[in-house]
């Protein structure tokens, strides 16, 4: 294969990969929202509730300090890799439904912390998680454990490359450890 032909093949494969990724993201939004439609939860709200249900968000460092429970809005935006502006509307809708609570961060009065409310925690653990795990099983039908691990590793590598492209000038890319 000539160098030019090899590059054309690489370009075509890249185009197919990114188009398929775009299609998968759209289908995740469409089918994920449909999976939780009985609860009126969108995929964006699902992501927020999921991030807030993690042990580090639920409990904080448990040192009695100002960061016990919840995440700052900025930290939540970084975990989800969305802008604070996009997150604000989602949080407002979840707060209006009583699924999350916001409070002033005791460590920084200019900052707000957000955490699952009692109702949000119950909805997440008792109703949404079983539906979500069922959805995952359907979406990953036919994937062996090894294929799932390989896919996750490929997505992690791709995400690291995206973070390099998204450096904000300070050299500080968003963290994704544990996801």
Which role does the model predict for each range below?
Residues 26-83:
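N-terminal helix-turn-helix DNA-binding core of bacterial DNA-binding proteins
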Residues 59-114:
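Canonical helix-turn-helix DNA-binding module
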Residues 1-39, 97-99, 146, 179:
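N-terminal leader segment of winged-helix/HTH proteins
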Residues 24, 28-31, 80, 123-142, ...:
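Alpha-helical linker/hinge and terminal dimerization helices associated
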Residues 1-9, 59-67, 145-179:
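C-terminal regulatory/oligomerization modules of transcriptional regulators
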Residues 3-5, 92-150:
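Charged, amphipathic alpha-helical coiled-coil/dimerization segments
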Residues 19, 47-51, 88-90:
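Base-recognition residues in the alpha-helical recognition helix of bacterial helix-turn-helix
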């Amino acid at each position: 294969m000539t160098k030019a032909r090899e590059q054309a093949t690489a370009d075509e494969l890249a185009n197919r990969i990114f188009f398929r990724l775009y299609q998968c993201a759209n289908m995740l939004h469409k089918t994920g929202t449909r999976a939780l439609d009985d609860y009126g939860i969108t995929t964006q709200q699902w992501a927020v509730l999921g991030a807030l249900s993690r042990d580090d968000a639920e409990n904080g460092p448990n040192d009695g300090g100002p960061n016990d429970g919840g995440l700052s809005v900025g930290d939540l935006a970084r975990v989800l890799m969305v802008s604070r502006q996009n997150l604000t509307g989602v949080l407002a809708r979840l707060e209006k439904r009583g699924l999350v609570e916001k409070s002033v961060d005791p460590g920084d009065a200019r900052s707000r912390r957000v955490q699952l409310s009692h109702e949000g925690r119950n909805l997440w653990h008792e109703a949404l998680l079983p539906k979500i795990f069922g959805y995952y099983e359907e979406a990953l039908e036919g994937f062996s454990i090894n294929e799932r691990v390989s896919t996750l590793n490929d997505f992690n590598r791709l995400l690291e490359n995206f973070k390099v492209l998204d450096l904000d000038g300070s050299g500080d890319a968003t963290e994704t450890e544990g996801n």
